[in-house]
UniProtKB/Swiss-Prot annotation:
Cited SMART domains: Fibrillarin (SM01206)
Disulphide bridges: none
This protein's record includes keyword Membrane: no
UniProt subunit comment: Interacts with nop5. Component of box C/D small ribonucleoprotein (sRNP) particles that contain rpl7ae, FlpA and nop5, plus a guide RNA.
Record function comment: Involved in pre-rRNA and tRNA processing. Utilizes the methyl donor S-adenosyl-L-methionine to catalyze the site-specific 2'-hydroxyl methylation of ribose moieties in rRNA and tRNA. Site specificity is provided by a guide RNA that base pairs with the substrate. Methylation occurs at a characteristic distance from the sequence involved in base pairing with the guide RNA.
Transmembrane segments: none
Annotated S-adenosyl-L-methionine binding sites: 72-73, 88-89, 113-114, 134-137
Family to which the UniProt record says this protein belongs: Belongs to the methyltransferase superfamily. Fibrillarin family.
Protein name: Fibrillarin-like rRNA/tRNA 2'-O-methyltransferase
Source species of the chain: Halobacterium salinarum (strain ATCC 700922 / JCM 11081 / NRC-1) (Halobacterium halobium)
Pfam families: Fibrillarin (PF01269)
Name of the top EC class for this enzyme: transferase
Regions annotated as coiled coil: none
Amino acid sequence: MSLPAGVQRRSFGDEDGVLATRGEPAYGEPVVDGWRRWDAHRSKLGATFELGLDTGLSGGDAVLYLGAANGTTVSHVADFAGPTYAVEFAPRPVTDLLAVADSRERLFPLLKDARAPETYAHVVESGVDAIVQDVATRGQADVALSNRQFLADDGRLVAALKARSEDVTADPAAVFEDLLGRLRDGYEVRATARMEPFHEDHLAVVATPR
């Protein structure tokens, strides 16, 4: 699995082979020679890279990021991607996200609900190269399906599915099977991996539109 152009493994102190992107610091992360440490324990996409999944991201991609929160992960994405549309529903995290975007001209924060793509369809370009999804809400598969309209025919969905957001009492493996079955209504699932030890009860998914 190759990393996208603009993502490298660098040395930070005594640690070698640490994921990093080149850009302005966003959340107090260590920076060495202009390279920002990308902590997989704080980032589902970072963990997906560490798990070795082929995301299809190559660098310079147009990205729709669903569930941007305060910008921790999407700040790294905007360091190596092209235009990056960052959708977040909660006003408080968006305040931080706006600050992150100040130093990233390719990052476009959107205070919108990922469950209602019609509210930002006039802003997001059609045919994006990738949808990166980290939406901790019930109906995660439905979010991916409803946003499929933005994805290029040869694009990729890179999602982190959280079992507890769907059902806090059910066995996570059963929840993931249900979610994958629903995703297959509009996607071909290419790869999956449980995200332990980085994130408990999460599943990384890479899929292409059907």
